Curated annotation (Swiss-Prot):
One of its GO terms (molecular function) is structural constituent of ribosome. This is Large ribosomal subunit protein uL13. It comes from the Bacteria. SUPFAM superfamilies: Ribosomal protein L13 (SSF52161). The keyword Thylakoid does not apply. GO terms for biological process: negative regulation of translation; translation. Belongs to the universal ribosomal protein uL13 family. GO terms for cellular component: cytosolic large ribosomal subunit. InterPro entries: Ribosomal_uL13, Ribosomal_uL13_bac-type, Ribosomal_uL13_sf. Part of the 50S ribosomal subunit.
Length: 148
């Protein structure tokens, strides 16, 4: 029996919608990354994008456990000497809801052109509404522990 290798034009991609309300950032991000990569499918092939489209709603209601709201730091640099900027999770969630989830998922995907193609299949929205009703996304219940 020959080993099966998926071709990019043969892959069937489904659309799923995930509600991030009261979900923990890291646990949610790891499951989304797994689905974007396609590791849940039997036809998974490491060098082919076999993943599904994921629409995340209520990203502004996502949480972290413990003191990570204040302790978790995000860094960026302007490119100029001394141009480093630092912010924490709470400030980032208030200003850019969903960016923390995007950074977390992006770090869990492969680096390079394949990873860039995978991250484009994730759509994040702060509220409950999204413009992807025409794709008829199926609700995906990710059973992660909610913050207590």
């Amino acid at each position: 029996m020959k080993t099966f290798s998926a071709k990019s034009h043969e892959v069937k991609r489904d659309w799923f919608v995930v509600d991030a309300d009261n979900k923990v950032l890291g646990r949610l991000a790891s499951e989304i990354a797994r689905r974007l990569r396609g590791k849940h499918k039997p036809e998974f092939t490491p060098h082919v994008d076999t993943g599904d489209y994921i629409v995340v709603v209520n990203a502004s209601k996502m949480v972290v456990t413990g003191n990570k709201g204040l302790d978790k730091k995000y860094y960026r640099h302007s490119g100029y000497p001394g141009g480093i900027y630092e912010t924490n999770f709470d400030k980032m969630q208030a200003r850019f809801p969903g960016r923390a989830l995007e950074k977390a998922v992006k770090g869990m995907l492969p680096k390079g052109p394949l990873g860039y193609a995978m991250i484009k299949k994730m759509k994040i929205y702060a509220g409950a509404d999204h413009p992807h009703e025409a794709q008829q996304p199926k609700p995906l219940d990710i059973n992660v522990k909610a913050a207590s």
